[in-house]
Amino acid sequence: MGKRIFLFILTNILVITTIGIVLSVISAATGVGSYIGADGRISMVALLVFSAVVGFVGSFMSLAMSRWMAKMMMGVRVLNPEKDSLTYDEQQLVDRVHRLSRAAGLSKMPEVGIYQSSEVNAFATGPSKRRSLVAVSTGLLHEMDDAAVEGVIAHEVAHVANGDMVTMTLLQGIVNTFVVFLSRIAAWIASRFVSREELVPIVHFIAVIVFQIIFSVLGSLVVFAYSRHREFHADRGGADLAGKDKMVHALRSLEAYTSRIKDDDQTAVATLKISGKRKASLFSTHPDLNERIRRLEAK
């Protein structure tokens, strides 16, 4: 899930920044939708409406693009048994995802993808349960045994069945609203300190972009915290689908993997992987592995 969250947040920041810039330029040129009056004061109601529109449109555009972005950025090759000649391992992967998806009650099977990487990673993404993607790295299939792979895939299918991407999008929309709102207030305050009137619009424009990026990074802490919370639910869902023993085995395999990789590789594992570091941090998308195992065993 970590790779998915990272791509979603990155896409979201780019989208809301682009939308904000376009709307600001249109507003400056036409005066339509401006939240700054002729007297230089901010209309809080107009700014809040503007922020909500940009925030939620941005988050839902990011959701709509999530599957395409994941395929493009990760180089995911979608496995289609009806059109492509698959290897035995690839066919096994497709069959496993479909079997677990049916067990989870999904009416339409997710796309199944694989991408070349030595990293142990898997993620699920997509705008809805009916338009989802479950992808794994070749490194995961190479490093893990069948039972661990089953647990990892069950965990990702549980994310799809739980509708975590849509819930995350709603949360991101709220965060975006605050980001856009606060960044423009901060930019307005900053522009008030500019003595040359002709430079005020330029300073305000640049300050909006800078503050929006800063607040977006800070706002991502809320999304990361929620992501860590949802991981426990996906672990339980994975245990229901594959069995608790396989889910625990998958987590222990991830723990063993993160223990033996080189320190230089640990940074890559920290925020982007299904495992994350063994110890969680504010910027982790996943909680402490030991805590995940403890909670699952106590289930």
UniProtKB/Swiss-Prot annotation:
It is found in: Cell membrane. Zn(2+) binds at H155, H159, E231. Binds 1 zinc ion per subunit. The active site is at E156. Keywords: Cell membrane, Hydrolase, Membrane, Metal-binding, Metalloprotease, Protease, Transmembrane, Transmembrane helix, Zinc. GO terms for biological process: proteolysis. The chain crosses the membrane at residues 5-25, 44-64, 170-190, 205-225. One of its GO terms (molecular function) is zinc ion binding. It comes from the Bacteria. GO terms for cellular component: plasma membrane. Its cofactor is Zn(2+). Its EC number is 3.4.24.-. It is a multi-pass membrane protein. InterPro entries: HtpX_protease, Pept_M48_protease_HtpX, Peptidase_M48. PANTHER family: PROTEASE HTPX. Belongs to the peptidase M48B family. This is Protease HtpX homolog.
